């Protein structure tokens, strides 16, 4: 059996092991209208303001939700920016690339904002926002590294999976070099191990464009 999922070692030790938010946990916003009151969960209300969130590990389910939200917002208004808030330790490379490809394909600019931690695929998506609109809050942390993975089974199966991980590593490094302006050699060197940056260091590196002190 082959484990094809590329994983990131900074797991929930960087984030609390929180349960999935249910109806009794998510804050609810009540709006008044001529037809009476309407209740929205907070994320649905923010979606109306074109604000979406990546606040967990990256997986296929999260990718499907974010892709759907971006496509919906593009259909609503193909010109107005979409804001993507990121607080994620990373996760599946293929799921992350699905989000990334959609960010590049939709017409609206994607404003990325790091709050908390953007690590591994989270940092990659942060850097993949529209140029000049990649932001971070002052006490957030950003980390880049190479994809990890594991395989088991016959030797030939392990070899196939190793080649796939190397392919994904090359793909991510090339894209990071494109988005940061760093050389491919430097990206390869810096991602060989966990490479943590402060927001200001991320600006100097080219991962983001600005540290913001106010959300207004």
Curated annotation (Swiss-Prot):
Enzyme class, first EC level, given as a word: hydrolase
GO cellular component: cytoplasm; endopeptidase Clp complex
CDD domains: S14_ClpP_2
UniProt-listed PROSITE patterns: CLP_PROTEASE_HIS
Entry keywords, A to Z: Cytoplasm, Hydrolase, Protease, Serine protease
Catalytic residues as annotated in Swiss-Prot or TrEMBL: 120, 145
Pfam families (UniProt xref): CLP_protease (PF00574)
InterPro entries: ClpP (IPR001907), ClpP/crotonase-like_dom_sf (IPR029045), ClpP/TepA (IPR023562), ClpP_His_AS (IPR033135)
Location relative to the cell: Cytoplasm
Gene3D superfamilies: 2-enoyl-CoA Hydratase, Chain A, domain 1
EC number: 3.4.21.92
Alphabetical list of SUPFAM superfamilies matching this protein: ClpP/crotonase (SSF52096)
Catalytic function, reaction form: Hydrolysis of proteins to small peptides in the presence of ATP and magnesium. alpha-casein is the usual test substrate. In the absence of ATP, only oligopeptides shorter than five residues are hydrolyzed (such as succinyl-Leu-Tyr-|-NHMec, and Leu-Tyr-Leu-|-Tyr-Trp, in which cleavage of the -Tyr-|-Leu- and -Tyr-|-Trp bonds also occurs)
One function term, GO molecular function aspect: ATPase binding
GO biological process, one term: protein quality control for misfolded or incompletely synthesized proteins
Family: Belongs to the peptidase S14 family.
Subunit structure: Fourteen ClpP subunits assemble into 2 heptameric rings which stack back to back to give a disk-like structure with a central cavity, resembling the structure of eukaryotic proteasomes.
Protein role: Cleaves peptides in various proteins in a process that requires ATP hydrolysis. Has a chymotrypsin-like activity. Plays a major role in the degradation of misfolded proteins.
Protein name: ATP-dependent Clp protease proteolytic subunit 3
Gene giving rise to this polypeptide: clpP3
């Amino acid at each position: 059996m082959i484990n094809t999922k590329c994983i990131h070692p900074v797991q929930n030790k960087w984030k609390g092991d929180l349960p999935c938010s249910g109806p009794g946990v998510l804050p609810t916003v009540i709006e008044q209208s001529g037809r009476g009151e309407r209740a929205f969960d907070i994320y649905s209300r923010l979606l109306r303001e074109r604000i979406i969130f990546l606040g967990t590990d990256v997986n296929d389910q999260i990718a499907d939700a974010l892709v759907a939200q971006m496509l919906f917002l593009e259909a609503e208004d193909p010109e107005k920016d979409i804001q993507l808030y990121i607080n994620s330790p990373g996760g599946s490379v293929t799921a992350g690339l699905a989000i990334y490809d959609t960010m590049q394909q939709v017409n609206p600019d994607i404003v990325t904002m790091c709050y908390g931690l953007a690590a591994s695929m989270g940092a990659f998506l942060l850097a993949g926002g529209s140029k000049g609109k990649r932001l971070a809050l002052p006490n957030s942390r950003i980390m880049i590294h190479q994809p990890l993975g594991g395989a088991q089974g016959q030797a030939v199966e392990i070899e196939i999976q190793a080649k796939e991980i190397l392919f994904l590593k090359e793909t991510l490094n090339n894209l990071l070099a494109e988005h940061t302006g760093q050389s491919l050699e430097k990206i390869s060197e810096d991602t060989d191990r966990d490479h943590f940056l402060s927001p200001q260091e991320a600006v100097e590196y080219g991962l983001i464009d600005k540290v913001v002190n106010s959300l207004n």
